[in-house]
Every structure is written in C-alpha cells, then in structure tokens.
Regions:
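Active-site-adjacent structural elements in enzyme catalytic cores
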Residues: 1-194
C-alpha cells in the first residue's frame, strides 16, 4: 500500500525534485525504482536501509553515455551486450576511471526515460524495497516504510517484476551476477565467444 500523502508528480517535476536532492519512486520496465540524483544519494541509502559502501546502479539515457562512465575503451563484449539489450533490463558492471567499478543501465520504460531527460543526467537507482526485501512490480506493492519516506512518485505502467540481468565485465572478467529469462549463463558465454 502506498504511504499516506504520497505526492504524485509529472516526470518534469520529478527531474526538478531530483536535482534538489529529493528521492522518489519511478516505474521501470523491471521493478519499481527508488531513484535519486547525486545530491540525494545518501538519503536513498538511508531510506533503503542499505550500507552506503554497497554498489548502486546508474541509469543513463543512452548506451554511449553509460559506456563512457567506465574505463575507456569499454570491453568489446560491453558494446555487444549494450547493442543487444539496451535500452532494457541489463546492468553492466565496468571498471571505473580512477579505480573501482560502476554499474550502468539504460532503461526502456518511457516514464523512466522522461524522468532521466528532465533530470538532465544519470540517476542512482535501486529496487524500491528495504535492503534484503522483495522488489515491487507496481507502485501499490511498495513497502509502506519506503513509500512513506520518499518525496514523490511518478505514475506509469508496471514493469515485468523481474529484476535486470547483471553482468560483471570488470577486471577482464565475464560473470553473470544475476540471470534472467532473456540472459542466461549459456547465452552470455555464447555472446562472449563472438
């Protein structure tokens, strides 16, 4: 159930609120996203009850934008996977400039795209559930503790309910961290072999 007094806003207003450091709920093609801009990142971790040292994905508006967040040049398999699955439910973990890793995704949901465009840059995103809890397909399913803590929600068609596939290409590896119906270990290995 959605929290009492949850404020529904347009994608354009959501972009403005995110630039101000607010945190919100946005539908994606997978599960409901808990999103924030850079100014709201610490609050996002607080709302989710997640250790700020844990990785979080960045949503981007285009494949080139997402791949540019990793060390240049991106691995050839990253380009191949991006071409096949983006926009869509795939998170790539890449080596980041200056060390560490970065998880990037280009969503396919029109509302998510509109919020990204309005925000004018990448958004930090995670599933809208308490750390360790189940992800929600629709806004109405979001844990009341989450919906009560966020600043806004943007309405839109619910996603599939299946979280995105996650492929780790950091350190020269090819590891499937989360399989989906559309990307299995066998399919990833076939794509990796070219």
């Amino acid at each position: 159930m959605l929290g009492f007094g949850l404020r529904y806003v347009s994608a354009a207003e959501a972009g403005e609120l995110l630039r101000e450091g607010r945190v919100g709920l946005v539908p994606t093609e997978t599960v409901v996203g808990l999103v924030a801009g850079k100014a709201g990142l610490s609050r996002l971790f607080e709302i989710k009850g997640r250790d700020s040292g844990k990785p979080i994905a960045l949503l981007c508006g285009a494949a080139e934008e997402a791949l540019a967040l990793g060390r240049e040049p991106p691995p050839p398999l990253a380009r191949s996977l991006a071409g096949r699955f983006w926009p869509g439910p795939l998170t790539l973990v890449l080596d980041a400039e200056g060390g560490g890793t970065v998880g990037v995704r280009v969503p396919a949901h029109p509302v998510t795209w509109a919020v990204l465009a309005s925000h004018g840059g990448q958004l930090y995103a995670t599933s809208a559930n308490l750390s360790g809890g189940s992800a929600s397909r629709a806004l109405e399913e979001v844990d009341p503790a989450i919906s009560a803590a966020v600043d806004f929600a943007v309405r839109g068609e619910p996603g599939s309910g299946e979280a995105s596939a996650v492929v780790d290409l950091s350190g020269g590896n090819v590891r499937l961290l989360r399989a989906t119906k559309s990307l299995t270990e066998d399919e990833l290995m076939r794509l990796a072999k070219g």
